[in-house]
C-alpha cells in the first residue's frame, strides 16, 4: 500500500511537491482554501481583460536553462510561447534623459557608455559580470545533502570560474554599487532596478544573466495559466486537489506530523505533511507554536520587511504594440507618493501588448 502525503497549499510549491510525490509513488492530497491554483502566481479576470499579478520573467524558460528540466517535467510550459523582451527596464527622467537597461549585456554596455563614457569602469564591471554569470550552469539534479563526496567536489570545481564574481556580488548591495557611477542618471536608475537598493547585487546580476542568455522569458498566457499547467500535470498523475478546503491544524503524534484537521472539523490522516503555505502561519497557528526553530525565529523577528508594493491594473481599448519592447517603464511624477513610510518620485508602468491572450 502506498504511503500518503498531505500537502497544504496549491501554489507553485504545493503543486510541484504533489507532482514529484506522485512521480515517486506516493498518494497525494492537496488542500487549498482558495478556488484556484497558483497562490501568489495568479491573474484576475475582469470582463474581457486579464490582469496578471506575478510572472514578469521566468527563470529557466529556455531549454538550456537550469530550471527548464523541472518546468518541463511539471507541464508548466507545455504549449507555451515565450517572449524575451529587448529591455528589462526603461527609466525616463524629467530632463528628457532616458536610460535603457537592455537585456543583452553587449547592447547595454554600448548604450551606457554612450551616455557616460567616464563611467567605463563600473559599466564594464557590471556587464562583464553579467556575461560571466550567464555561462554558469548550477547543478540542479540533486540536493546538496544527496550529492555525496564526489558530487560535491564536482560541484565545487564547476563553480570555481565564477567564484570572484559571486563573492563580490554577495558582499555588495545594489546601492553600494550604484555609488560607483558618477553619472547621476545611471546612479539613480541603477538603485531602482529592483525593489530596494539594500538588496544584494547578486540579485540583479543573476537576473540580467538569465535575461542575457534568453532563459528568463515571459510565458504567454500569464501566471494563472502557468499554474494551471502544473495543476493539470498533478491531476493527470492521479493526485487529488481539494479546493475551498482550508486546513486549521497539523496533527502531530509523538513529534511527527500524521495528518491535518480541516476547518470543518474533518481529520485527514497522512504519513507525511508538506506545508507549502506561509511559514509563520504554519508554525504559529497550524502547529500552535509548539515547533520552534531558531533560524526561522531570527528571520521573523530581525529581518527587514519587504518594501510595500501597490499594483493598479487598467483594461483599456488602446493599441500599445508601438509603445516599446520593455518589461517596465519608470516615469517621474509631479507629486511624490508616500507608501509604507517611504517616498517615491516615480511610477513604474507595464503594458501587456506582447500577450494577445490578456485582452479582447
Regions picked out by a protein language model, each given a short descriptive name:
Residues 3-135:
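N-terminal glycine-rich phosphate/pyrophosphate-binding loop and immediately adjacent elements
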Residues 29, 246-248:
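Residues located in well-ordered beta-strands
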Residues 84, 243-245:
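Short loop/edge segments at beta-strand edges and connector loops
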Residues 91, 241-243:
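Conserved active-site beta-strand element of glycosyltransferases/polysaccharide synthases
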Residues 95-96, 198-203, 251-258:
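A short, glycine/Asx- and small/polar-enriched loop/turn
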Residues 131-237, 244:
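Active-site/ligand-binding neighborhood in enzyme catalytic cores
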Residues 218, 248-360:
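Mid-domain catalytic core of redox enzymes
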Amino acid at each position: 500500500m502506498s504511503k500518503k502525503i498531505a500537502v497544504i497549499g496549491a501554489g507553485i510549491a504545493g503543486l510541484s511537491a504533489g507532482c514529484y510525490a506522485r512521480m515517486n509513488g506516493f498518494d497525494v492530497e492537496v488542500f487549498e482554501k482558495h478556488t484556484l491554483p497558483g497562490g501568489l502566481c495568479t491573474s484576475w479576470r475582469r470582463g474581457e481583460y486579464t490582469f496578471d499579478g506575478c510572472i514578469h520573467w521566468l527563470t529557466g524558460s529556455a531549454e538550456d536553462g537550469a530550471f527548464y528540466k523541472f518546468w518541463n517535467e511539471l507541464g508548466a510550459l507545455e504549449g507555451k510561447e515565450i517572449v524575451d523582451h529587448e529591455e528589462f527596464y526603461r527609466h525616463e527622467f524629467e530632463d528628457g534623459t532616458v536610460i535603457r537597461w537592455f537585456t543583452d549585456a553587449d547592447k547595454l554596455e554600448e548604450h551606457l557608455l554612450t551616455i557616460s563614457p567616464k563611467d567605463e569602469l563600473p559599466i564594464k564591471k557590471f556587464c562583464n559580470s553579467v556575461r560571466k554569470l550567464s555561462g554558469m550552469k548550477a547543478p540542479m539534479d540533486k540536493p546538496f545533502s544527496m550529492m555525496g563526496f564526489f558530487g560535491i567536489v564536482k560541484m565545487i570545481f564547476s563553480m570555481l570560474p565564477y567564484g570572484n564574481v559571486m563573492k563580490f556580488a554577495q558582499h555588495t548591495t545594489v546601492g553600494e554599487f550604484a555609488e560607483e557611477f558618477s553619472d547621476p542618471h545611471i546612479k539613480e536608475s541603477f538603485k531602482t532596478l529592483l525593489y530596494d537598493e539594500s538588496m544584494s547585487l547578486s540579485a540583479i546580476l543573476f537576473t540580467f544573466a538569465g535575461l542575457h542568455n534568453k532563459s528568463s522569458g515571459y510565458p504567454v498566457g500569464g501566471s494563472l495559466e502557468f499554474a494551471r499547467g502544473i495543476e493539470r500535470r498533478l491531476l493527470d498523475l492521479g493526485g487529488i486537489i481539494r479546493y475551498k478546503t482550508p486546513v486549521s491544524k497539523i496533527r502531530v503524534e509523538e513529534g511527527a506530523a500524521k495528518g491535518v484537521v480541516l476547518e470543518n472539523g474533518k481529520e485527514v490522516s497522512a504519513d507525511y505533511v508538506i506545508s507549502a503555505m506561509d511559514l509563520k502561519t504554519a508554525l504559529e497557528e497550524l502547529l500552535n507554536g509548539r515547533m520552534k526553530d531558531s533560524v526561522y525565529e531570527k528571520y521573523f523577528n530581525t529581518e527587514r520587511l519587504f518594501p510595500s508594493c501597490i499594483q493598479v491594473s487598467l483594461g483599456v481599448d488602446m493599441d500599445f504594440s508601438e509603445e516599446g519592447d520593455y518589461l517596465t517603464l519608470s516615469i517621474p511624477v509631479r507629486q511624490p507618493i508616500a507608501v509604507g513610510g517611504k517616498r517615491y518620485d516615480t511610477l513604474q508602468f507595464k503594458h501587456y501588448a506582447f500577450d494577445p491572450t490578456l485582452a479582447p
